[in-house]
């Protein structure tokens, strides 16, 4: 019965599974690079009862080991078996998904700080080892295919700066300012008066230190502040890689706050990850281990929230393939760094 279920779950690829009882299950259509994995009894229970969470947890705990191929090969098989064509589903399924989306993303101020700390306060030293030298933790802009990650992140900041159309002396708010690289760039040229807000104590400390070393303390101020608590206005607002932490129930509040904080002739550039299809729910593994409270929005959700807030959309740009290249660079650097394995235990690294 379990073997039949596994074969039903895996529709494509070439997957061989060594079962706890010694039997071997072949699944998929045989196409692509072969992958062989071995599961313990505990790992098998996890896979069958809750695949979206169980696959990752089984791998982390070594209840699932890969003997041929790579983890990325396995994930490709699993992803393709899940299908790429959006299915609308029944009204009940859509209602369940909407309920799950809401419950997962109730991000009040306390929850927001806790969720940000879970991901960003792990260790600045970790991020320094696989990000670019400016510590840009968001999609780079590969204007040319031969660009290095450093060059692509410089191009990303220039691309955003061009969209913002800042003139010297403008007050600019950076929502989710991270380690401060974008704020410092816009302060240096074209000379904006930057305010960056973050909920991460680790990011705040390093960003403040970096601004001081660069001689930009008079041009850039970083605050440990929830964006919803700001009460001043700005000529421009930029937010890169932060909307994913807002949560679907708070999209309208987010854009209403953006409108409230902008001057009458102000404008904002919001840069975020977007899901391929319409509204959905966050993967269980991502929700538990990577971005608690996070939710990747569908474009339709963003447009609706922007319009409801009374803002005008003047430009939409899709950078999906640029993020694929960015993630590839991060993964390569993470795996190649000799110090990272000494900083964390095997479960964290897996």
Stretches with model-predicted labels:
Residues 228-237:
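A short acidic, Gly/Pro-enriched loop at the edge of an enzyme's catalytic core
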Residues 252-264:
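A short glycine-rich, Lys/Arg-flanked "PGG" loop and its adjoining helix->strand segment in the class I
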Residues 265-273:
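Conserved beta-strand signature within the Rossmann-like core of class I S-adenosyl-L-methionine
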Residues 207-208:
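Conserved SAM-binding loop
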């Amino acid at each position: 019965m379990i073997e039949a279920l596994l074969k039903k779950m895996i529709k494509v690829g070439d997957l061989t599974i060594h079962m706890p009882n010694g039997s071997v299950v072949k699944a998929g259509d045989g196409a692509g690079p072969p992958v062989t994995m071995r599961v313990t009894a505990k790992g098998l229970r996890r896979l069958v009862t809750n695949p979206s969470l169980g696959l990752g947890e089984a791998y982390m705990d070594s209840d699932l080991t890969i003997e041929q191929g790579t983890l990325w090969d396995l994930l490709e098989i699993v992803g393709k078996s899940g299908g790429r064509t959006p299915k609308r589903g029944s009204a009940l399924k859509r209602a369940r998904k909407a309920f799950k989306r809401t419950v997962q993303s109730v991000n009040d101020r306390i929850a927001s700080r806790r969720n940000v700390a879970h991901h960003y306060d792990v260790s600045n030293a970790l991020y320094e080892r696989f990000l670019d030298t400016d510590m840009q933790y968001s999609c780079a802009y590969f204007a040319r295919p031969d660009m290095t990650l450093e060059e692509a992140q410089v191009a990303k900041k220039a691309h955003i700066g061009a969209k913002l159309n800042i003139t010297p002396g403008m007050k600019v708010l950076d929502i989710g300012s991270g380690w401060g690289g974008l704020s410092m760039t816009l302060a240096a040229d074209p000379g904006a008066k930057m305010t960056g807000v973050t909920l991460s104590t680790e990011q705040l400390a390093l960003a403040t230190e970096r601004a001081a070393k660069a001689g930009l303390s008079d041009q850039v101020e970083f605050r440990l502040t929830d964006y919803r608590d700001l009460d001043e206005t700005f000529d421009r607002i930029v937010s890169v890689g932060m909307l994913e932490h807002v949560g679907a129930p708070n999209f309208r509040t987010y854009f209403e706050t953006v409108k409230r904080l902008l001057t009458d002739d102000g404008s904002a550039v919001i840069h975020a990850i977007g899901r391929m299809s319409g509204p959905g729910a966050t993967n269980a593994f991502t929700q538990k281990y990577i971005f608690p409270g996070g939710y990747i929005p569908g474009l339709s959700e963003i447009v609706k929230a922007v319009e409801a807030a009374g803002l005008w959309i003047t430009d939409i740009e899709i950078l999906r393939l640029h993020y694929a290249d960015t993630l590839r660079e991060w993964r390569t650097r993470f795996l190649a760094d000799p110090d990272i394995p000494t900083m964390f235990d095997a479960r964290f690294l897996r």
